[in-house]
């Protein structure tokens, strides 16, 4: 190939090296249902091997947002890929779907093979943990679109659930219990505000906060809920689920509730990670608003019948997940969420 393409700002040799570096990580994620290998124009997956009677495909796409800016600024690229996978698979999990495969999209000013490898390693680690095949992706070098050193990461996940097992919130009733699964921290939402508060505070991100460097706290990857929730679903009838992302409690919990019902949440029933206290104090933010921005320590919720709540908590504990009975379902025609203690 002529040098014209390279002179326009695209280094195809760096692209080849990045592909070579990521190949071993991608291969770790393969499932038996994947047909063919890497490098084709389209990735293929054999649904017939799932042994499902009436599979419904569920898809979701998301990115990591401005959390990427922190990772880029401090040269920590190994966990951002986990965030990209978690944001997608946790979303489709709310329908009861088992994630099957994932595709990534990385766009950058300049392909740096070592950085791309770190990102894809994180993606692959999350895919292995959730038994999700990384069957395809795209790495785009676009020097005119991004500043030097910058990149963006997004993903697309597809899962499947038996049609009769699809969870859509239609069976939610008064008296059912809301169980909250602990988050690992901020996860991947609210980072425009987080970065603003970091800049205003003037803190050294290498300094310690709660026995860890600030930067590690801020870049803690989003928790993956796939394994524990699928284990729970095998044993307990789940009526609705929510992934607590952008918009916090106020925007996410109502998404799975039928009209005329509300989730009454006791905010004193679960611990709030200290980093949220720091953010609230630094920004002088009202508590009510914090629950409209952040997950506040609960990254995922499931709604079950009251009689099943103790068993559900036991199963989640066996899956090494911190979980709490944080509320219950009530009748309410005017609002879909009631927060007590704010």
From Swiss-Prot:
Main location group: cytoplasm
Reactions the enzyme catalyzes: 2-formamido-N(1)-(5-O-phospho-beta-D-ribosyl)acetamidine + ATP = 5-amino-1-(5-phospho-beta-D-ribosyl)imidazole + ADP + phosphate + H(+)
Highest taxon of source: Bacteria
Pfam families for the chain: AIRS (PF00586), AIRS_C (PF02769)
EC assignment: 6.3.3.1
Pathway(s) where this gene product acts: Purine metabolism; IMP biosynthesis via de novo pathway; 5-amino-1-(5-phospho-D-ribosyl)imidazole from N(2)-formyl-N(1)-(5-phospho-D-ribosyl)glycinamide: step 2/2
Intracellular or extracellular location(s): Cytoplasm
Sorted UniProt keywords: ATP-binding, Cytoplasm, Ligase, Nucleotide-binding, Purine biosynthesis
An example Gene Ontology molecular-function term: phosphoribosylamine-glycine ligase activity
Cellular component annotations (GO), alphabetically ordered: cytosol
BP GO terms, sorted: 'de novo' IMP biosynthetic process; adenine biosynthetic process
UniProt similarity note: Belongs to the AIR synthase family.
Name of the protein in question: Phosphoribosylformylglycinamidine cyclo-ligase
Species for this entry: Staphylococcus aureus (strain MRSA252)
